[in-house]
């Protein structure tokens, strides 16, 4: 495994750990999700370019489209929760809360 692959895998792992450990605020969760998507995009692009897979060259672009949709939905949810409750805690997303 080359150094670049190892760095991308570590970036994905650190983002996943950040998502699991710092999940009280929604903004930090969204940033960790974006870090995971960015490392996946770079890793998939490197694998496709190194293996010369021409049929799978659209997969990283599709991943970027899903990442943009995820970011837009996450930011709109962040704005909605922060205007409704005045803070960006993830625990405010519970619909069963009285």
UniProtKB/Swiss-Prot annotation:
Localization per Swiss-Prot or TrEMBL: Mitochondrion inner membrane
Catalytic reaction annotation: a ubiquinone + NADH + 5 H(+)(in) = a ubiquinol + NAD(+) + 4 H(+)(out)
Transmembrane portions of the chain: 1-21, 29-49, 61-81
Enzyme Commission number(s): 7.1.1.2
GO terms of biological process kind: ATP synthesis coupled electron transport
Gene3D superfamilies linked to this entry: 1.10.287.3510
4Fe-4S among keywords: no
Membrane disposition: Multi-pass membrane protein
Main location: mitochondrion
Gene Ontology cellular-component annotations: mitochondrial inner membrane; respiratory chain complex I
PANTHER family with a match to the protein in the record: NADH-UBIQUINONE OXIDOREDUCTASE CHAIN 4L, NADH-UBIQUINONE OXIDOREDUCTASE SUBUNIT ND4L
Quaternary structure and partners: Core subunit of respiratory chain NADH dehydrogenase (Complex I) which is composed of 45 different subunits.
Task performed by this protein: Core subunit of the mitochondrial membrane respiratory chain NADH dehydrogenase (Complex I) which catalyzes electron transfer from NADH through the respiratory chain, using ubiquinone as an electron acceptor. Part of the enzyme membrane arm which is embedded in the lipid bilayer and involved in proton translocation.
Name of the featured protein: NADH-ubiquinone oxidoreductase chain 4L
UniProt organism field: Platyrrhinus helleri (Heller's broad-nosed bat)
């Amino acid at each position: 495994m080359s150094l670049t692959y190892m760095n991308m895998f570590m970036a994905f792992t650190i983002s996943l750990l950040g998502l699991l450990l710092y999940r009280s605020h929604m903004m930090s969760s969204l940033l960790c999700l974006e870090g995971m998507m960015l490392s996946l995009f770079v890793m998939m692009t490197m694998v496709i370019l190194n293996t010369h897979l021409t049929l799978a060259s659209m997969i990283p672009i599709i991943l970027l489209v899903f990442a943009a949709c995820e970011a837009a939905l996450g930011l709109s949810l962040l704005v909605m929760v922060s205007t409704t409750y005045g803070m960006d805690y993830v625990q405010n997303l519970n619909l069963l809360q009285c």
